[in-house]
C-alpha cells in the first residue's frame, strides 16, 4: 500500500510511468524483497501503480492530448484525471491487500500520525512543485507552459539548495536527458499538424465514423471497440505516438455519439498506460524486469492480475462519466 501511495505522490511530480518505475522501483523493490515479499509481486505492484502518475496532474501526456484534440482545456483535463487516478490507486491497494493476506506476506510497520507528519516535513518542498502546476493552471494564474517553466526553476532550486541532492555535473546530465525526451515530443507535435491536415484532406475521420457506425449504433459497443483498438496499439506503439495518431481520427466518432473529449482524455491515457505493461514493447515491463532481475515472461504472468484490475477501472471511467467529469464541472471548467 505504501508503494502505491508513493506512486501517487511521485506521479504528481514526474507524470511518467517509466520514471516512476525506474526511480521508486530501484528503492522499493529491494526493500519489499528484504521484508519478505517475493520479487514478482513487488515488481508487479510497482509497475501497475506507476500508471497513476499519468492520470494525476500535472501530466504532460494530458497536455499532448489537449494539443492533438484541438485545444481542449488543460485545466479541465488535469481535474478530470484526479478521481480516476485515485480510484486506480484504491483498487490496486485493495487487490494488493487481498493478495498479501492470501499469500501470508509479512505485515508492515503500523500506521502512525507522527510518522506521516515526519514524512510530510521532509517532502513538503518537493510537493510544492505539484502545487505550482496544478493550482496555477486550474485557477488561471498562469498557463500550462508558464507553470511548467516556473515549476522547473523551483524544482532546480529545491534540489540544489534545499535538499542538496544535485550538483552541476548531475544538472548537465539531467538537461541532456530532458532534451532527448523534449526532442521526441517536439517532433511528434510538429508532425501532428501536417498529419491532421492530411487525414482531414483525405476525409479519413469521416470514413472512420461511417465505418464504425456501420458496424453498430450501440454507444456501449462502440466505446468497447475503441478501447480494444487503443489497447492493441498500446502493445506496439509509444504513448505519445498513439495520442497524436489516434486522437484526430477517433474524435469525430466520439463527438457523434456524445462522448466528452475531456472524459476520453482520461480513457486514452489509461489505455496507453496499460500498454506500457504489455509485451512486446512494454517499456515499464522491461524496466521492472531490469531492476528486479525477474525474466519478462515470469514477470508478465504475475502482472496479469493487476492488469485485470486496471481494465476494471478503465471500464468504470469509460461508462461512468461522473468519475471524470464531476470535479471539472464543480470547478466550472466544462
Annotate each PLM feature:
Residues 1-334:
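Alpha-helical transmembrane segments of multi-pass membrane transport proteins
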